[in-house]
Amino acid sequence: MQRMVILGATGSIGSSTLSVIESNPDAYSVYALVANTSVEKMLALCETHRPQIAHMVDGQAAKSLKQRLPTSLNVEITTGEDQLIDIVSASCVDSVMAAIVGAAGLVPTLAAVKAGKRVLLANKESLVMSGRLFIDEMRRSGARVLPVDSEHNAIYQALPESLQSNIGYCELEKAGVSHILLTGSGGPFLTSELASLASMTPAQACKHPNWSMGRKISVDSATMMNKGLEYIEARWLFNAADDQLKVVIHPQSVIHSMVQYLDGSVLAQLGNPDMRTPIAHCMAYPQRIQSGVEPLDFFKVGQLSFSEPDFNRFPCLALAMEACKQGQEATTVVNAANEISVQAFLENKIKFTDIAKVNEACLSQVAPQSLNSIEDIIRLDLQSRTYAAEWVKKI
């Protein structure tokens, strides 16, 4: 029986993880559920899954949950960063699903890595922000990190076992790998007139053609910043050079990514666009379990199409790739700026096309500096958020 902590339990990935657990009740149990402010959802999850601990990042939400949760459930309610670190580090915990969206997931995810846990990494921002610090800590502690993002999970499955067991330090060329091909659907605005993008609403941006996701990641998919962050994450996970990474537009979201080998072979992972598949793969690796996902029907799929990304349409993708070339400071800055600009768009404070403008303005201000600790990263993250917020006000 594998005991799990789910960071971001009330979100999309958290819900999918709990669904996989429900499909395999004899193999997994929930030790702790972690959320930010969603008291109603946490109440329901506690009643269904009976965790030992329910942790709310927001202190007021924790008080509300404590008042409303029946004592008969015998669930301990906690709040505070130190308590969260204790939860992911607990000796009884086998696996941690790291699914808190954004920079907020960095500290608990890194704490799980330091504790040597099996970390199912859905929080791409952790690697985007901390990069080498994260990878080195993983090697020091002996933590096993398994990528949950459908693209990175696909790449992982298409790599030889020798590279799967050496995440962060892969020698791609020695293993015969020539390129990693990251696929992306292009989002809801792939074929929209460029002139119309400025008038796109949050509701339109959040209407992804294939995937069911949260609002922030849905907007990131519409701008393709999500693919840019995944590009950075792939660089760290697979120790890939810029010339070994390519982005491919694939509107059907059936091929989740590919690995191209020196002999001309291309290995791809295919499946229906449902996050329960990569989640189940990570939970059970190296075994396979039921995910609850319908098998892919090739006759219904019919055709698969591919194209190069248009950087005029997707400037955020170009910015993220440029930040990756510049280094750790730049990726930390662009991630922070993007979180602020996307939130401003969702609140109707800026236009869809202003997201890239804010991100570019912040990236242009990156100054050389050393990021030698988590404190350095958090400080730069906060500085970048402040600068991005100022730009939002100017627009």
From Swiss-Prot:
This is 1-deoxy-D-xylulose 5-phosphate reductoisomerase. The keyword Oxidoreductase applies. 1-deoxy-D-xylulose 5-phosphate binds at K124, S150, E151, S185, H208, S221, N226, K227, E230. Signal peptide: none annotated. The gene is dxr. Belongs to the DXR family. NADPH binds at T10, G11, S12, I13, N123, E125, G214. Its cofactor is Mg(2+); Mn(2+). InterPro entries: DXP_reductoisomerase (IPR003821), DXP_reductoisomerase_C (IPR013644), DXP_reductoisomerase_N (IPR013512), DXPR_C (IPR026877), DXPR_C_sf (IPR036169), NAD(P)-bd_dom_sf (IPR036291). Catalyzes the NADPH-dependent rearrangement and reduction of 1-deoxy-D-xylulose-5-phosphate (DXP) to 2-C-methyl-D-erythritol 4-phosphate (MEP). GO terms for biological process: isopentenyl diphosphate biosynthetic process, methylerythritol 4-phosphate pathway involved in terpenoid biosynthetic process. It comes from the Bacteria. The lineage of its organism: Bacteria, Pseudomonadati, Pseudomonadota, Gammaproteobacteria, Alteromonadales. Its EC number is 1.1.1.267. Pathway: Isoprenoid biosynthesis; isopentenyl diphosphate biosynthesis via DXP pathway; isopentenyl diphosphate from 1-deoxy-D-xylulose 5-phosphate: step 1/6. Mn(2+) binds at D149, E151, E230. Keywords: Isoprene biosynthesis, Manganese, Metal-binding, NADP, Oxidoreductase. It catalyses: 2-C-methyl-D-erythritol 4-phosphate + NADP(+) = 1-deoxy-D-xylulose 5-phosphate + NADPH + H(+). One of its GO terms (molecular function) is manganese ion binding. It is an enzyme of class 1 (oxidoreductase). Coiled coil: none annotated.
